[in-house]
C-alpha cells in the first residue's frame, strides 16, 4: 500500500463523511462549529507528553512474523485526538503515518484514537498478525522495521474485505473524535471544581434517576430498578409500559404498575436541596431533569429555573379532550389501581363501553371489543412516553442555555437517552464538565468524575465550599467525613468514612 492508496483512504473517509463532519474540497476537513462558540485559551489544545515518535513505523517480530505494536498510553490518545481536532484530516494522516503503509497501520490509527474494532472475524484476523511490545519505544521498533524493509515486510497480511472494514472503522473513529469534546487539560481535581463553582454564575445542571434513589424511588435501568421488577408482567420489553401506542390501545398496562413509580409527596433529597442552594446563590442557570417525579418543585426550585425534559406527574391530561388537572388529583386513582377518567368525556365513554357500567377499575377495562380506543376519556400523567415528542420548552431553552452556561454538572444520569444525552456535546468545549454519579459514563468526556452516592458528593462539595445545604438532614450530613480516592486522572471515588466506635 503506497501514498496513492493512503490518499484514496483520505478521499474515502471524506466522501463517506460528507455532510457530517467533513466536506470534500482539496482533501480538507472543516469541523462543524457550534453557533457563536467562543474561542478560548482554555480549549484543549495543549500537547501532552508522549513516548511515541511520528510517523510511527511498525516493526516485525523476526521469529513470529507478527507486527509489533508499541504501547499506546492515554496521553498518546489525547495527543492524537488534539492533533486531529486542530488540523485537517490530510495533515493528520500524513503526520502520523509513514508514506508506505498496509492495513495494520489503519488499525494502529484506530487504536491511537482510543478505539478498537468490534467485528469478531476482523479482530481475530488482526490478532493473528499483531503482537504488542510494551517495553520498546516507537523509535526502537522503527529501527527493527527499517532493517527488514528489503524483505517486503509491507505486504498486507489481511484480506481485502478486512482492509475495507478497517477503513470504515477508522472513519467512524474520526467522526466520533470530531463530534465529542475533549477533556480540559488543566481541570481534573476537586479543588478545580470547587474554585470554579464559587465563581460560576450560570451553571447548567443535568439530573437523572440517581438524584432520587436515596428516597426509595427506583432507577428504571439499574439491576434492582423498576424494569427488573416488572418482568413478571410478561412484556416483551419492560419499557412498553411507557409506550404511547400501547397506552392508547390499553391504558391498563400502565395503570397496573403506575403505583410503583408514583413519587412521594413533599419529599426531596439533599441533592435536590444542593441545586436549590445554587439557585439561592444566583448561580443556577437551569436544571434540566430527566426525572418524572417532580421532586425539584418540592425542593423549591423555581419553575423558570426548571426544565422537566421528560414531563412529570405534576399535571395530568385527558388523552381525548386534553382537559388538564394537577397531577396529585389522580394519585388516589393510581394507588387504587383505577383508571382516572375525564368528567367531560365520561358519559360518552359509558356509551362506548356499556359493559363497564361506569366502573373505572383497571381490570374491567382490559378486554373490550369496541373499535374505540380503550384510552377514550382516560387521564394520562403529562410525562413523555416513548413515541412522544419532548416538551417544547426543552427545545426553546436549551439552544440559549448551552451558549450562556459557564459550568455543566451532570448528576445521577447514565446519559443513555437522546436528545438529553447530547447536551454534553452541545456545550462549548471550553466550559468545564463534571459528572457526579455512582458509575462512570464512558461514552462522554467529563473533565472530572466524582463517583459515589449523589447526596454524599453534594455534601462533600458543599463542605469544601463552606456552604450550607438547605435540607433538614444537613446538620447531620455536615458532621460526616469522606474518603476521596483518586482511581484515575480526573476520577475520584467518594465514600463516607466509617464512624469510629465509641469506647
Curated annotation (Swiss-Prot):
Biological-process GO terms, alphabetical: cellular response to starvation; DNA damage response; heterochromatin formation; negative regulation of meiotic nuclear division; negative regulation of mitotic recombination; regulation of DNA-templated DNA replication initiation; regulation of sporulation; regulation of thiamine biosynthetic process
Cofactor: Zn(2+)
Record's keyword terms, sorted: Chromatin regulator, Metal-binding, NAD, Nucleus, Repressor, Sporulation, Transcription, Transcription regulation, Transferase, Zinc
InterPro entries: DHS-like_NAD/FAD-binding_dom, NAD-dep_histone_deAcase_SIR2_N, NAD-dep_sirtuin_deacylases, Sirtuin, Sirtuin_cat_small_dom_sf, Ssirtuin_cat_dom
Subcellular locations according to the entry: Nucleus
Residue ranges that the Swiss-Prot or TrEMBL entry lists as coiled coil: none
Protein name: NAD-dependent protein deacetylase HST1
The organism's taxonomic lineage, starting at the top: Eukaryota, Fungi, Dikarya, Ascomycota, Saccharomycotina
